[in-house]
Regions:
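Flavin (FAD/FMN) cofactor-binding and adjacent substrate-gating region
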Residues: 72, 92-160, 165-166, 292
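C-terminal catalytic lobe of FAD-dependent flavoproteins
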Residues: 275-361
Length: 361
């Protein structure tokens, strides 16, 4: 039996450890804090699962696979982690990100619908569509309960044989395994500074109080204004997150207190897009972080000097939803069943693949 040590129990590490165990590997999963910790890029209450990624089919196809795997995990464990509420992209033009995404979804046979602005009024109790050219609607998209889903991957992995250990592991510790997978999220670049180029930036998220009419409304993304969120879920409130460039931070020492400027941005967007919520109170906040690669593609590659070590990460603010499908891809690469994609290689990155939920040009 082959052995693996997976360092990091965020969604990438937890899912990969579980996947390898299901394939018969002897797996140890090591985490310095706790699965689902707010310090990780996987920490938080909810994450959108959407298929649209511009014209990059690879991620759309993986999101489709991941959705099925999340639902299978939910059904197998009897633990609720998936909200099938759909998702709307608010399009400012007919030939932008949403149009490129629609072409990709059509190529892959993923359900989508282009709505005229007025038709989108039926999706929400209150919505301003005056600035929209249309709405790209993804009926099979939804929201994951992120922290619980991460913890569930660890728990289900343990049922499959994963040994979970609480410890801080560094490259100098030279962990023992036929394969060592470093899935360290926002810590990956600090562990391998000459190999990994990631920016770790803060992201302030706000939840606003709303009445029951907002329960179960679709998630939303606004690419041009770089905001995303969802309606009322599980008593959390209506989520609004500005997806704009944030300050670089240290995930170990960051004081997770939201900044007033970010609240102003979120509230301004909320009042403009959903007018009936203009005066809604803030009932919850989160401060998390992204681990951003230069082009927003993930990292999956061997260490150039340690052939048995793999570095995976660079979720770049769009990685969580892919969890179990990404783990299958990583496990295939580790087992030599599949070549890693060229755009996941270590080394310099150029440009922006436009895989996040906002335009920054």
């Amino acid at each position: 039996m082959s052995s693996a040590v997976v360092v990091g129990a965020g969604v990438f590490g937890a899912a990969t450890a579980r996947e390898l165990a299901l394939r018969g590997w002897d797996v140890t999963l090591v985490e310095q804090y706790a699965p689902g910790t707010v310090r990780s890029a996987s920490g938080g209450d909810t994450r959108l699962l959407r298929f649209a990624h511009g014209d990059v089919d690879w991620y759309a196809a993986m999101a489709r696979e991941a959705r099925l795997k999340w639902i299978e995990l939910q059904e197998a464990t009897g633990t609720h982690i998936w909200e099938p509420i759909g998702l709307a992209w608010f399009a400012r033009s007919e030939d932008g990100f949403e149009a490129r995404s629609r072409a990709s979804l059509d190529r892959l046979g993923i359900a989508n619908e282009w709505l005229q602005p007025e038709a989108a009024r039926s999706l929400y109790p209150s919505v301003n569509v005056d600035d929209l050219a249309g709405v790209l609607y993804e009926p099979e998209a939804g929201v994951l309960h992120a922290r619980r889903a991460t913890q569930l991957l660890v728990e289900d992995g343990e049922q499959a044989g994963v040994i979970y250990e609480s410890a801080r592991v560094l490259p100098a510790d030279d962990p023992h395994g036929d394969v060592v997978i470093w899935a360290c999220g926002p810590w990956l670049a600090s562990l391998f500074p000459t190999l990994v180029d990631l920016k770790v930036t803060r992201r302030d998220v706000f939840f606003f109080g709303a009445d029951g009419s907002w329960r179960g409304t679709p998630g939303f993304c606004d690419y041009e204004s770089a905001h995303y969120g969802h309606g009322e879920i599980a008593g959390l409130g209506v989520k609004v997150a500005p997806d704009l460039p944030g300050d670089e931070v240290d995930p170990d020492t960051l004081e997770r207190i939201p900044l007033p400027a970010w609240e102003r941005m979120a509230r301004e967007y909320l009042g403009n897009r959903f007018p009936s919520l203009a005066d809604a109170p803030v009932i919850g906040t989160r401060v998390c972080q992204y681990d951003l690669s230069a082009d927003t593609h993930f990292i999956v590659d061997r260490h150039p000097e340690r052939d048995s070590w793999w570095l995976i990460g660079g979720g770049s603010g769009h990685g969580f939803k892919h969890g179990p499908a990404f783990a299958e891809y990583v496990a295939d690469c580790v087992e030599g069943k599949r070549e890693r994609e060229p755009f996941h290689a270590l080394g310099p990155r150029a440009g922006d693949a436009g895989l996040r939920t906002g335009s920054y040009g």
